[in-house]
C-alpha cells in the first residue's frame, strides 16, 4: 500500500473554544452546573459569586449514591432512599450502571460484574440491559437510562438550590473511558433533559479544582484518582491558568467496590467453613454483608479494626466477625499494587522523572485507604501527597469551574483547558496492520490527515476500518466503526489518492472522513460505536419514558399521600375511641360502636385494596367522615363542631392547641 503523509495539524484549545457562544446564547443557557457522575456516588456543583458551591441534596448530603430502586408499589427512588432499601429489595435496586455503560454484552468485565450484581442483567441488541420488577410488571432499562435517573436527581438538587430550571451541564468521565462510553454518558444527559456542553476527564477536573489558585510558574501535577469503580492517573502541567494534560492511564474497572468484593468473598468462605452454609444464593444476606463490609472498610481508614455485626444474617442466624486493617490489606494487596503500574506508565509517557512532579493530588474516596497513600508516597520517594482537597468533591468542583467558564462567568479568569485523547486512533491497512493517525495523549481538539491508496488494480471501493488501541495489529485493538468509499475510477493499484482525515472535538468524539482526491467523492462517519450506541429514536423514546416516569412518580406520590391520609384518619379515630380521656370517654356505647365498625371496615378495605386509585381513597375517607362528623358534632352541640384529630382541618387545629 502506498501511503503519503499529507499534513498533521494539532489544534490547541484556547479560551475562545470555551467562550465561542455569543452573548445572546449565554443568556439562554442559564446557570451551567458541573456534575461528577460516579460509579457509587455522584456530586453536583455550581460556580456562583466567584466561587464554587458543592450542593447538598434533600437529605443534607453533599454526595448522593448513584442508586435507583423500584418499590413493589411501583414507586421509583433515587439516591439515599434507593441505597437504604438495598438489603430489603436487592433485585430491584440498581447500582454500578457506570460499569455497564457503553460496553457490549460480551465484554469480559460485564460478564464478571453480572455474577455479583443482585439485579438481573440481560442481553438486548448486543448490550447489557437491566431488568427490574416495577409493581408487578417487568421492565428493561439501558444503563444510560439508569445514569439519566441519577443525573435527574443531581439536576433537581441544583434546581432546588438555585431556585430555577437547569438545562445545561458539564459532566465528567474517567480519563480512560473510550469513545462509546463517552457517547453513552452524553446520551444519558440527553435522556435526563440536560444539554451536556462538555464531557471532561475526571482527573483533569480534579486538577482544575486543585490548581485554580496556583498562578506562579509551571507546575507538573500528578492526579491519582481511585473511586468506587474506576481508576485514573493523569499528569498535567499548569502554567498561569493553562491546564495541559500530558499523559493519562488507568483502569476503567478498578475501585473501592472491588476491594469490598474481596472482603465479602473472604467472609462468605469463612462463614461456610464455620457453619457449612453457603449464603451466595441469598441476595438479601449478600447485600446485608456488602453494606456492613463497606462501613467496616471506611472505619479502617481511621482505626485498626472494625467489628461486623449482622442480626438475622442467614436462616435466622446472626453474623459477627472482626475485620482488621492488616487482613483488609492482605486481601487486596495485589489490587493496591496494581495501581502503581499506570503511575509509572504516565511518567514514562511524559518523559518525566519522579523528582519532576511538583504535586501529587489524591482524588476519589478510595484514596483515603492508608495503604494506598503509603504506596503512592513510597513510589515518589517519601513525597507527601497534597491534602488541601476533599477527595469526594474535587471532580465536581473542577466540573463546576469549567461550567462557570461555559456560562461566561468572568470570575473564572484566564482558565484554558488542554485535554488529551486517551488511546491511539488509526485505521486498518493491508495485512491487518494498525496504521496510527492520532497517537494517544495528543491534545484535543485535533485533526490529522494522511493519504492512502488502493491495494489492487481497478479497485472500485475502499473499506475504512477505524480502531482505537496501542497494539500493532488491529485484531488486538478495539473496532470503533467501518464505512466504505465507493465509486473509485478504475486505475492501477497505488495510483488513486484517498485522503483520510481524523478529527476529534473537545468532548473527545471522533469524526472520520475519506475523500478520493481525483473525483472529490467523499464519505464520512461520526464514530458513535453504532452497535453499542443508542439510536436517536431510542434516545427520544427514553426521554419520553423519563418524562413519563416523572409524571408517574408525581401521580404515585399523590396516590400514596391520599392512601396515607385515609389510613392515618382511620387509625387516629381508632386510637381516640379506645382512649377514655378522649372520644372513648365521651360517646354513647351505640355511637362508639358505629364509629368502631366504620373504622374497622375501612382498615380492612385498605388492607385488601392497597392498589386502589386516588378517587377510591378519597371516597372512602369521605364515607368515614360522613359517619363520624355528625356523631362528634352532637358532642359539641351542632354542625359547627371541630373535627376529631386526624380529620380534615386537623392541621390547623394542631397548630392552635392550648
Swiss-Prot record:
What's the entry's take on its domains?
Answer: The interdomain linker regulates the chaperone activity by mediating the formation of homooligomers. Homooligomers are formed by engagement of the interdomain linker of one hspa5/BiP molecule as a typical substrate of an adjacent hspa5/BiP molecule. hspa5/BiP oligomerization inactivates participating hspa5/BiP protomers. hspa5/BiP oligomers probably act as reservoirs to store hspa5/BiP molecules when they are not needed by the cell. When the levels of unfolded proteins rise, cells can rapidly break up these oligomers to make active monomers.
Q: What is this protein called?
A: Endoplasmic reticulum chaperone BiP
Activity regulation info? The chaperone activity is regulated by ATP-induced allosteric coupling of the nucleotide-binding (NBD) and substrate-binding (SBD) domains. In the ADP-bound and nucleotide-free (apo) states, the two domains have little interaction. In contrast, in the ATP-bound state the two domains are tightly coupled, which results in drastically accelerated kinetics in both binding and release of polypeptide substrates. J domain-containing co-chaperones (dnajb9/ERdj4 or dnajc10/ERdj5) stimulate the ATPase activity and are required for efficient substrate recognition by hspa5/BiP.
SUPFAM superfamilies in alphabetical order: Actin-like ATPase domain, Heat shock protein 70kD (HSP70), C-terminal subdomain, Heat shock protein 70kD (HSP70), peptide-binding domain
The protein's UniProt keywords, in alphabetical order, are: ATP-binding, Chaperone, Endoplasmic reticulum, Hydrolase, Nucleotide-binding, Signal
Signal sequence interval, chain numbering: 1-19
How does the record describe its quaternary structure? Monomer and homooligomer; homooligomerization via the interdomain linker inactivates the chaperone activity and acts as a storage of hspa5/BiP molecules. Interacts with DNAJC10. Interacts with dnajb9/ERdj4; leading to recruit hspa5/BiP to ern1/ire1. Interacts with ern1/ire1; interaction takes place following interaction with dnajb9/ERdj4 and leads to inactivate ern1/IRE1.
Q: Write out the ranges of the annotated region (Nucleotide-binding (NBD)).
A: 127-281
Which spans does this entry mark as compositional bias, Acidic residues? Answer: 648-658
- What organism is the protein native to? Xenopus laevis (African clawed frog)
Q: Which GO terms describe its biological process?
A: chaperone cofactor-dependent protein refolding; endoplasmic reticulum unfolded protein response; ERAD pathway; midbrain development; negative regulation of IRE1-mediated unfolded protein response; negative regulation of protein-containing complex assembly; neural precursor cell proliferation; neuron differentiation
Q: Where does ATP bind?
A: 38-41, 98, 228-230, 294-301, 365-368
Q: Where is this region: Disordered?
A: 634-658
Family designation: Belongs to the heat shock protein 70 family.
